[in-house]
Amino acid sequence: MYIKVKFLKNGEPHGREYTYKSTFPVRVGQEVILPGGGNGVVTEINVPEEDVESFKDKIKEIESVVEEDEQ
């Protein structure tokens, strides 16, 4: 599934949304670990494939989901 994520800065969502692929079950508001080790928060799930068609070959996949007790 395609999701939208905002990077975390000082623990708060910051900046614009970026699109990632996720093979993990995620929900809006959940913290995820991004490629390269940064963290972000999910702002949208189930982004339609037609919305990302023009750049889907460049979309990276999230590395994992931060479990609630890890936050």
Please state what every model-predicted region is.
Residues 2-71:
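Terminal, basic amphipathic appendages of nucleotide-handling enzymes
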